[in-house]
Regions:
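Divalent metal-coordination and catalytic microenvironments
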Residues: 31, 46, 51, 72, ...
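Sec/Tat signal peptide C-region and signal peptidase I cleavage site
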Residues: 17-21
Length: 562
């Protein structure tokens, strides 16, 4: 006991001497520090010089250029959003308003369809556009990352390379197995992306073009990433009736390719299967016991977001948007389409969002590109069908035909109890599956999922403070160091001298999400300060306009391309 006390005193003395000797730019005083490791919180101060933490402890005699009084506030590592879709909205507003105000300091992008590579056989319909108009003016990750840095970003950014992006570059919008030459080209594109800073390979397999990619091709892509220490992040092929088989596929890919696996937003999105989350988690735990590095993440909501087009069978999407819409207009195909939408495809692993939600009332329309249909934003599909006064399938096809084949949609398809069970598992972390938007300006349109604004405060307010599903320390670990470890970022996610100074300071007694499905454009409350690379981006809840974000790359491969 005496030895421990002496070491503690020596540690505090060393911390103070370090701060005094090096000089301090920013000093956070009197906060309750939750350091990101899962260990108990403690009271203390944090000193920052340039972009790093230089000292922690009781630094009462230290002085700094700027001080933050964190009395009665909680100080944690900046939140790392392991699953984020701000790839293109950052080009409209690098301030990342809705994410910064949640306490997010780093965003992991690139699910399925990443920002690169662009070109090859990709058509206009398979390429994303910058919100508000404008085509990408880059072709690979190097140019995309350079574009972000020229503009300036308030959060740090990292990205996977999307398997769908690779697929459409090589094969366009065609199903079927790739040739040997095409597979070689896919491997080459993955290697190039990894050399330019990609974290690994991601997939989005529940709908085209991702659903066209077979397991063997995914293994080949992941093997190419494995040479660079990459990992595999997957939105699985099915989260409904085929969810157990899809988890098994993800595990199999990790085992065969020799890469760590992170299953995106683990859920059981099928009413008839609610309550089976313990068995699903057990299958993952069993693989972990056998040596497969497989983990998962969740978001704290019982609804997801995808596209209304995903309830149309995959075969109807082949050939791109024009071919897709032509099939919707073909009266000879309507009986088959209607049957498969309402009943699924017997013997198929296709994830049918209609059967998952249990009906039209489980779908809420997010945004519509056609001005004539804007009035339906924020309405449930059954309400839209009634307003259009026509059969449900006719209304569905009309919406898709009139809006370019795409209508972002919120689906209410999984249970609160299943989500809570998953949230409590030590190998399941937290991510938003959201996008940086804002309550004003060009990113304030539409009717987005409330997770865009509220994911992390919702966990801390509802599931920690109110319902005691998690301890504060464990919730913070799931938002910080757990996510940093997944993507090989070694100098963030923990508060410790020498680590990068990404810090979130919040009021644990009042933090809460405000965004709802009915009124989503509302910032969360309770986050007081956000510091990114040593610079204050959120000050007393107000965005300072600072854009100190950088591009993050894997650090756990030692920089060696094996």
């Amino acid at each position: 006991m005496r030895t421990s006390s002496v070491l503690c005193c020596l540690g505090l003395a060393l911390a103070y001497a370090t701060a005094r000797a090096q000089g301090i730019d920013l000093l956070i005083r009197h906060g309750r520090i939750v350091d990101g490791t899962g260990n108990p919180s403690f009271l203390g101060d944090i000193a920052i010089r340039d972009n790093r933490i230089v000292a922690m402890g009781h630094l009462s005699a230290a002085a700094a250029k700027k001080e933050i009084d964190a009395t009665r506030l909680t100080v944690s590592p900046g939140f790392i959003d392991i699953h984020n879709h701000s790839d293109y909205t950052l080009l409209v507003d690098g301030g990342a308003q809705s994410m910064i105000r949640q306490g997010v300091t780093s965003m992991i992008l690139g699910e399925g369809e990443s920002a690169g590579p662009i070109g090859g056989r990709q058509t206009a319909s398979s390429r994303r556009v910058i919100p508000g108009g404008g085509d990408p003016d880059w072709s690979d990750f190097s140019a995309y990352f350079a574009r972000l840095l020229r503009q300036g970003i308030s959060t740090n950014v990292a990205s996977y390379v999307g398997s769908s992006q690779i697929w459409t570059y090589v094969r366009g919008e065609r199903a079927g197995p790739p040739t040997a030459a095409e597979l070689d080209q896919m491997r080459l594109l993955v290697r190039k992306a990894m050399e330019q800073g990609a974290l690994g390979v991601s997939s989005s397999l529940s709908g085209p073009p991702g659903s066209w990619i077979d397991t063997a091709t995914l293994v080949a892509m992941c093997q190419a990433a494995a040479r660079y220490g990459g990992s595999y992040s997957t939105h699985m092929r099915s989260e409904g009736r085929g969810v157990f088989e899809s988890v098994a596929e993800a595990i199999d890919i990790g085992r065969r390719a020799g890469v760590p696996v992170d299953i995106i937003h683990l859920k059981i999105a099928e009413h008839s299967m609610w309550g089976q989350m313990p068995e699903l988690v057990s299958s993952i735990a069993h693989a972990r016991e056998q040596g497969v590095q497989v983990q998962a993440n969740v978001y704290p909501y019982r609804a997801g977001q995808n596209d209304l087009a995903t309830i149309i069978p995959p075969w109807a999407h082949e050939g791109g948007d024009q071919a897709f819409i032509a099939r919707l207009k073909d009266p000879t195909l309507r009986p088959r389409l209607e049957s498969e939408i309402l009943n699924g495809i017997p013997g198929s692993s296709w994830y049918d969002h209609y059967t998952a939600t249990g009906g039209w009332d489980g779908m809420l329309l997010v945004s519509l590109s056609n001005p004539q249909y804007k009035k339906f934003e924020g309405m449930h599909m059954n309400e839209v069908i009634a307003a259009l006064n026509k059969p449900a399938i006719d209304a569905l096809f009309e919406l898709l035909e009139a809006n370019g084949g795409s209508v972002p949609t919120v689906y209410f398809h999984h249970s609160e109890n299943d989500m809570r069970y998953a949230l409590q598992q030590p190998f399941i972390s937290i991510g938003s599956d959201g996008t940086a938007v804002a309550t004003e300006g060009p990113l304030s349109s539409g009717h987005p999922h409330p997770r865009y604004y509220g994911t992390f405060p919702r966990v801390l307010g509802r599931y920690v403070r109110e319902d005691h599903v998690l301890t504060l320390e464990e919730a913070i670990r799931k938002m910080t160091s757990a996510n940093a470890a997944k993507v090989g970022i070694l100098d963030r996610g923990i508060l410790r001298p020498g680590m990068m100074a990404d810090v979130t300071i919040f009021d644990a007694a009042h933090i809460i999400d405000m965004a709802t499905y009915e009124k989503p454009h509302q910032y969360a409350t309770g986050v007081e300060y956000v510091i990114v690379n040593g610079r204050v981006v959120l000050d007393h809840g107000h965005h300072t306009g600072a854009r100190p974000g950088v591009i993050l790359k894997r650090q756990d491969a030692g920089g060696v391309h094996r």
